[in-house]
Structures are given as structure tokens and as C-alpha cells.
């Protein structure tokens, strides 16, 4: 009997092993896919970008950071774009791109877009190039989450400040203002508030490199809500290169504040601006200081400049005229009276704007970024380069139909539902091969199985 019971477990195992072996023979192995290659099928329609920069001495050279497609470069004012990050920068979400003024070969990129939609992807730190984007090295801050701004010392490319918003999905300590003095070999956190409040913006006084302006914001994305604002946020200033900080309060909103963008006027460093999202509607708006930040006053409360403040509400000062400032929101606006009015709307190829970079040698030359990509203007915004040359579309979900050759369908963020062929028609351009299959930016698409 002992031998019988010893044999039974073996029989049972054998009984189950035989069917499993049969099933495993039908499971595709890795070898089957070895000869398959990825093929780009389109579309050439730009996707969301929240990070841009340009090269002062090369007026036709610009950089674009997208929220899902990495870093791109143009050397012909936006007529053609080339990806310069694939295979080196390991995430596609880019929050900041900054080119050194003193050495234009040096570029810093911060990963993780800091305008936190619900479909945002987190970053994995800072990357650096010393050859205009040909090669990239990872230089730290892997847990900094979303990077809102990188500010490079105007005379020394090794001195860099980073506004780290932190993990957008939960609390962490790797957030605040960071500084390096050796080109990214070592980083020091120079201003920190809490594990739920991070830095959204950082600026260097153009006439005093030891004076630093920064904004802090409490924000977190949860599956069911957006946590936006607290009494910890605000505007902070350091006058000794980040060793000591003071919260600026005179004339600014009290209580809860959300996203804040700050800016020095390069033409008059005593003039500062802050676009502030405040809990009290009557306190939010554009604030200005004309005494270096000691006193502030609200000069504009127009809601078109600050709606959905957590997503838009960007400001950029003209490099040579202290009275000109640009505001990016659903529209792109220009003020010529120091921010009191924004009567001029500049029409860009796409709405939902996230900022502008202006060449200080010729302020008619600029690059704007928005939910449709990036576009270049050489005439102050009168006309722009196309966005139909950027394969950076941000799709929510992919569906295919049953025809042969099959077509692919997807809803593009802030664009339309699109249909793309799996096998393009050679006689047609990439633009002609795809078409809008429906409006809105839906995430789920259902295709009839036979029609």
C-alpha cells in the first residue's frame, strides 16, 4: 500500500503536465517576433508641448519638449523637426528645456511636464547635453517628478537652478528648488517647504545673479480629483544665491494660493510679475512689483488670463521693453502697458498655450508652445510655422478595425479622433493618408466589425 500511495501523486502530476505541455506549444515564443520591426504610420500632427527654448545667436534654431514624444530640434525656424532624445532620454514627458546663454552648446532638460492634466506622465530627472543635443547624459534628481523650470546662470553654464514640483501622484521629499555649481555632478536642495509642496518656477535676476525668485505650489493628481493649492505655497526670494529665503507677502493674496508663475523684466530688473491662482476669486490675477519685490499690487484680474490656472497661466516678459508682457492661456495675449490690459490677442495655430521664448536680439523672433505642438514666428506673431510636421501626437487609446489592410484609430489629446492606415498609399503624403474620424478628444473608440 505504501508504494501505491507513493505512485498516485506522480500520476496526478503527469495528468496535469500533459495538457500544460500541449498549451505551451501553442504560445508564441520570442523568436517568432524577432524579425518584426516597428514602422511609423503617422500622423504628422503635433501633440502637446509645455517646454521650449531657442538659441540667441542662431535665430532659426529652437528646441521643443513634448509631453510624450521627447525633445525635438529645428534649425530652419520650424520647417523641419528632428528628434534628438530617442534612445538617450528614457522618458517621453518633458517639463523644461533650457539653453545656456554663455555656451549655447550646453542644454539642460528636465523630464516630467509640470502642467498636470489627468493623463500626465512623471519624469525621471535631469539630462544634459554639451554638443547641442547630439548626446545626452543623465545628471540626477531621479525622483523629482515633474520639473517646472530650469534656470541657468547667464555667465556660467555649470551653475543651474531647478524648480522641482515633485511626485504629482503623492507626497515625497524630492521637491523644491535645487542648485548645482558643477554642471550637475552634485545637487543641493536649497529651498524646501514640505513633502506635498514643490517649486513650480525659478528665475534669476538678470542684473544680479545672486537674487533668485521662486514660486511654490501644492498640487497632487488623484484618480478622482485634483488637489490644488494650500497656504504653504507662494512667492519666495533669495538674495544670496539660495542660502536664505524670504516669503514675499506685501500686497499679495492671503490664504490659499495655487499655481504661480513669476518673471523678472530683463529690461528693468526692479520690475517683477506674478500670475497667481488664489482661492478667493477677487484676489487672483496678475500682480506686479516695481521695487524689486518689496511691494506688490494686482494690476489685472481678467479671467481670460488665469482660467484653469493649474494648466495655463504662464507669463513671459519681453526682453527689451519693460512694458510688454505676454500671457498664455486658451488664447495667447500681449500687453504693451505693463500688464494693465491685454487687448491684443495673437492667434497661434492651436489653442491652449503654455509659454513663449523670445529672442533678445530680435523680439520678432519667437517660439510658442501649446496643445498642438510648437510653432515659430519671425514677425512677432503675425504668422507661424506649421504644426503638421511634428509626429508627436498624444493618444489616449488605440483601436484597429477588421479591414485589410487595417486602419488604426485613436483620440488625440485636445485634437480630434484620427484614422491612420497601417499600410500607407505611396502616392499620397502622410497628411493625406490620415483623416479626422470624429470630433473631440475621446479615449474610447468602437469600430463596426464589418463596416
Residue ranges and their predicted role:
Residues 1-26:
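Bacterial Sec-dependent N-terminal signal peptides
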Residues 25-451:
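Beta-propeller blade termini and top-face loops
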Amino acid at each position: 500500500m505504501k508504494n501505491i500511495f507513493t505512485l498516485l501523486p506522480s500520476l496526478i502530476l503527469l495528468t496535469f503536465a500533459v495538457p500544460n505541455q500541449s498549451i505551451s506549444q501553442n504560445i508564441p515564443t520570442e523568436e517568432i517576433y524577432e524579425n518584426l520591426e516597428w514602422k511609423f504610420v503617422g500622423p504628422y500632427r503635433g501633440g502637446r508641448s509645455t517646454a521650449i527654448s531657442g538659441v540667441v545667436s542662431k535665430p532659426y534654431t529652437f528646441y521643443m519638449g513634448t509631453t510624450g514624444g521627447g525633445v525635438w530640434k529645428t534649425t530652419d525656424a520650424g520647417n523641419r523637426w528632428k528628434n534628438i532624445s530617442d534612445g538617450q532620454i528614457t522618458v517621453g514627458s518633458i517639463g523644461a528645456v533650457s539653453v545656456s546663454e554663455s555656451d549655447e552648446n550646453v542644454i539642460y532638460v528636465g523630464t516630467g511636464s509640470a502642467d498636470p492634466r489627468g493623463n500626465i506622465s512623471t519624469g525621471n530627472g535631469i539630462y544634459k547635453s554639451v554638443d547641442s543635443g547630439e548626446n545626452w547624459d543623465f545628471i540626477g534628481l531621479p525622483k523629482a517628478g515633474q520639473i517646472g523650470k530650469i534656470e541657468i546662470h547667464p555667465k556660467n553654464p555649470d551653475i543651474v537652478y531647478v524648480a522641482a514640483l515633485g511626485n504629482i501622484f503623492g507626497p515625497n521629499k524630492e521637491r523644491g528648488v535645487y542648485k548645482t555649481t558643477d554642471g550637475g555632478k552634485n545637487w543641493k536642495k536649497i529651498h524646501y517647504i514640505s513633502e506635498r509642496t514643490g517649486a513650480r518656477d525659478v528665475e534669476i535676476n538678470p542684473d544680479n545673479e545672486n537674487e533668485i525668485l521662486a514660486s511654490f505650489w501644492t498640487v497632487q493628481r488623484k484618480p478622482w480629483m485634483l488637489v490644488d493649492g494650500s497656504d504653504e505655497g507662494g512667492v519666495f526670494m533669495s538674495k544670496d544665491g539660495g542660502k536664505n529665503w524670504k516669503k514675499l507677502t506685501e500686497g499679495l493674496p492671503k490664504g490659499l494660493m495655487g499655481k504661480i508663475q513669476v518673471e523678472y523684466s530683463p529690461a528693468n530688473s526692479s520690475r517683477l510679475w506674478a500670475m497667481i491662482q488664489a482661492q478667493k476669486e477677487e484676489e487672483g490675477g496678475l500682480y506686479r512689483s516695481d521695487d524689486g519685490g518689496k511691494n506688490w499690487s494686482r494690476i489685472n484680474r481678467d479671467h481670460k488670463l488665469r482660467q484653469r490656472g493649474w494648466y495655463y497661466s504662464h507669463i513671459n516678459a519681453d526682453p527689451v521693453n519693460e512694458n510688454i508682457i505676454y500671457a498664455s492661456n486658451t488664447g495667447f495675449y500681449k500687453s504693451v502697458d505693463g500688464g494693465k490690459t491685454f487687448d491684443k490677442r495673437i492667434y497661434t495655430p492651436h489653442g491652449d498655450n503654455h509659454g513663449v521664448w523670445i529672442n533678445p536680439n530680435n523680439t520678432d523672433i519667437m517660439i510658442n508652445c501649446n496643445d498642438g505642438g510648437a510653432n515659430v514666428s519671425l514677425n512677432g506673431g503675425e504668422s507661424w510655422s506649421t504644426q503638421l510636421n511634428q509626429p508627436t501626437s498624444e493618444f489616449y487609446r488605440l483601436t484597429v478595425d477588421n479591414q485589410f489592410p487595417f486602419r488604426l484609430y485613436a483620440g488625440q489629446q485636445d485634437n480630434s479622433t484620427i484614422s491612420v492606415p497601417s499600410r500607407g498609399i505611396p502616392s499620397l503624403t502622410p497628411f493625406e493618408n490620415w483623416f479626422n474620424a470624429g470630433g473631440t478628444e475621446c479615449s474610447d473608440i468602437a469600430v463596426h466589425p464589418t463596416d
